[in-house]
């Protein structure tokens, strides 16, 4: 059991110097204003502004700036700097928090009607701990990763305690009859623009210090048990947010706890069980609501919340194929397009010089099947002075070029990634080599000289990849794609030796198409672009491929699985399912396991089958448009009966994928499986009382 009150507000020796509310407010505003400059690509301005102050808010701001750079680029040196700054911020905030609690009765200190004295500094500690935890988990050291989880736990407890203060405030306001002060106001496009708040009636300050001293959080407590009615959802112009310290605490607690709940809800099944054992419980819906609430505020935290929402929606949601059906009027788990577009437009207006928000605009276009526009946005002359943002821009450009089969640009861009970022150089070389392999195959029969040059480059980049694999680690483990790349190239080298052919002729199914599949590029493609992928896949069985007759069931299964994925994206579900049944499920799974084998085929096929079943549902078709053809054309009366069967079968395949023994890329595929199972459970809950 954790005594939150004694930890958060325990009595410690404190300085006799009190914290003046005016100087505290000035420090907060100065620090947040300076730190926000990094989101407009003004790194020097942010660093210079923050160097002028020594307050806990300035220390936190310096930590935030380093943290943003660290998480955008994963560079070890920047992560070390971030860790040092965040440790300093945590220590400073702890001292100020104890001082604020000790001097809480001084006449010149700020007294909030919502939060106990010193809560703003408790939040600073939690933010520093949360960011330190992320840096620790990203670190290559297992020891640092474990320390990161310890910090995460401390931040989790603090944030939960702060949010319980808000719940207590809401309850007291209701009990005293002042319902207007906690009335939920109409939500705008994620930023509260244009809405007017009901003036808050005076509410007596709540003595939460005593309440918190008796509050315990056990390791198995579910902090996410409260619903939307227990959350403050007021807009920034509400009377309860007259003081910027309260704005900072409210927006900060919502952002930090929201991102925690969201991230924990996304982790793969095996890992989520471990997190549950040590007291972490995710809640995607509540987490997203909290992020949207934080994004309303015109400060650094509001912008970070907006970046998180856009990143989740244009990245994770579009990466996953099975997501909850949108809820009319207040959808947060799906893809609320108008709301997201309004949020992005506001951020672009606030930060016109930033390449970061341009990157998000590109991602949004890609997520909405406008890959040409997405690529064009990233091919401009402007460069970010922030190396980490520039690396992200080039990486995103590389992926878009890959989806569009722009092989020359794809290869050039991934080679540029090698220079800009050291995170996964083996993968960058592998995809660059794969792009040149595609160029080689395209012209081998018409221009032997040019084809030979592309073959030479393909071999050069393929052989550069394995020595770089394993250089970077996540929680002391090799990155999933590093393992994949090393095995693939070893497999091709072994085949080249066995078949006595050049390396480029020992490669099987188009590795670019395989990569498009793993990055879920098909969901971003138009019908015409999907047809191009089908054409590229057809090369394997063409006369141009002299080694196809030597291929075994493994490579042929990969070809059919990739074809099935393209067919699903085309909404040709019957064909996709039949292809999976006859080409993969009819095979003994032992044929796909063993040395140098692609052991991911079977579990991924189960996920693909589940995705087809989910997308065939009458509800899905009503929202997204019907499939190109279907052998099952139900009447309205049988829609629900059919949908129940489809969801049941979908869940069966997902559970098989979730329980599959360890395989290559299981962590990556596991993210999709976790999201899918959650979507299915939400559907089951919504339809539990509906007769079928």
Curated annotation (Swiss-Prot):
Protein name in the entry: Inclusion body clearance protein iml2
Protein source organism: Aspergillus niger (strain ATCC MYA-4892 / CBS 513.88 / FGSC A1513)
Polar residues biased stretches: 175-184
Cell compartment(s), UniProt: Cytoplasm; Nucleus
Gene Ontology CC: cytosol; mitochondrial outer membrane; nucleus
Source superkingdom: Eukaryota
Chief location of this protein within or outside the cell: cytoplasm
Stored InterPro entries: Iml2/TPR_39
Family according to the record: Belongs to the IML2 family.
One Pfam entry name: Iml2-TPR_39
């Amino acid at each position: 059991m954790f005594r939150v009150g004694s930890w958060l507000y325990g009595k410690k020796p404190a300085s006799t110097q009190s914290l003046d509310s005016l100087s505290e407010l000035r420090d907060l505003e100065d620090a947040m204003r300076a730190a926000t400059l990094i989101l407009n690509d003004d790194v020097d301005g942010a660093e210079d502004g923050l160097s002028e102050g020594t307050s806990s808010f300035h220390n936190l701001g310096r930590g935030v700036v380093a943290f943003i750079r660290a998480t955008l680029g994963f560079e070890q040196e920047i992560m070390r700097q971030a860790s040092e700054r965040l440790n300093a911020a945590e220590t400073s905030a702890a001292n100020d928090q104890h001082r604020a609690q000790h001097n809480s009765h001084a006449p010149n200190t700020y007294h909030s009607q919502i939060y106990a004295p010193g809560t703003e500094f408790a939040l600073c500690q939690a933010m520093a701990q949360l960011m330190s935890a992320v840096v620790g988990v990203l670190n290559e050291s297992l020891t640092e990763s474990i320390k990161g989880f310890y910090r995460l736990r401390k931040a989790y407890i603090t944030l939960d305690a702060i949010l319980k203060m808000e719940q207590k405030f809401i309850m007291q306001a209701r009990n005293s009859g002042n319902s207007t002060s906690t009335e939920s106001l109409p939500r705008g496009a994620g930023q509260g623009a244009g809405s007017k708040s009901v003036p808050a009636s005076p509410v007596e300050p709540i003595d939460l210090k005593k309440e918190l001293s008796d509050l315990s959080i056990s390791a198995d407590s579910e902090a996410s048990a409260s619903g939307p009615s227990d959350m403050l959802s007021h807009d920034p112009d509400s009377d309860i947010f007259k003081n910027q310290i309260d704005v900072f605490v409210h927006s900060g607690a919502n952002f930090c706890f929201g991102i925690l709940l969201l991230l924990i809800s996304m982790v793969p099944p095996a890992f989520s069980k471990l997190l549950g054992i040590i007291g972490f419980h995710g809640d995607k819906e509540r987490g997203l609501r909290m992020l949207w609430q934080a994004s309303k505020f015109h400060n650094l935290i509001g912008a970070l919340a907006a970046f998180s929402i856009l990143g989740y929606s244009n990245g994770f949601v579009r990466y996953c194929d099975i997501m909850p059906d949108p809820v009319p009027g207040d959808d947060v788990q799906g893809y609320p397009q108008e709301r997201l577009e309004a949020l992005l437009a506001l951020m672009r207006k606030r930060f016109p010089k930033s390449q970061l928000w341009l990157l998000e605009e590109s991602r949004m276009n890609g997520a909405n099947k406008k890959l040409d526009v997405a690529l064009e946005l990233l091919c401009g002359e402007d460069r970010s002075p922030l190396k980490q943002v520039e690396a992200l821009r080039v990486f995103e450009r590389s992926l878009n070029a890959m989806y569009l089969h722009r092989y020359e640009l794809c290869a050039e861009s991934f080679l540029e990634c090698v220079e800009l970022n050291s995170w996964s150089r083996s993968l960058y070389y592998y995809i660059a080599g794969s792009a040149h392999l595609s160029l080689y195959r395209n012209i081998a029969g018409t221009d032997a000289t040019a084809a030979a040059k592309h073959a030479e480059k393909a071999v050069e980049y393929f052989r550069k990849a394995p020595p770089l694999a394993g250089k970077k680690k996540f929680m002391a483990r090799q990155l999933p794609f590093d393992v994949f790349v090393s095995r693939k190239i070893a497999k091709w080298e072994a085949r080249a030796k066995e078949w006595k052919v050049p390396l480029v002729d020992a490669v099987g199914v188009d590795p670019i198409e395989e990569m498009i599949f793993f990055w879920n590029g098909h969901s971003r493609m138009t019908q015409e672009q999907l047809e191009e992928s089908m054409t590229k896949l057809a090369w394997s069985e063409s006369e141009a491929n002299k080694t196809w007759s030597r291929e075994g069931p493994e490579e042929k299964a990969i070809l059919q699985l990739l074809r099935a994925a393209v067919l699903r994206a085309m909404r040709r579900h019957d064909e996709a399912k039949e292809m999976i049944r006859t080409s993969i499920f009819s095979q003994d799974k032992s044929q796909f396991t063993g040395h140098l084998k692609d052991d991911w085929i079977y579990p991924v096929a189960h996920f693909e089958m589940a995705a087809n079943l989910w997308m065939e549902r009458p509800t899905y078709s009503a929202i997204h448009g019907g499939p190109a053809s279907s052998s099952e054309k139900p009447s309205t009366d049988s829609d629900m009966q059919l949908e129940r069967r489809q969801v049941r079968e979908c869940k069966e395949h997902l559970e098989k994928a979730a329980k599959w023994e360890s395989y290559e890329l299981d962590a990556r595929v596991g993210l999709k499986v976790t999201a899918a199972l959650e979507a299915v459970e939400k559907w089951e809950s919504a339809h539990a009382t509906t007769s079928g």
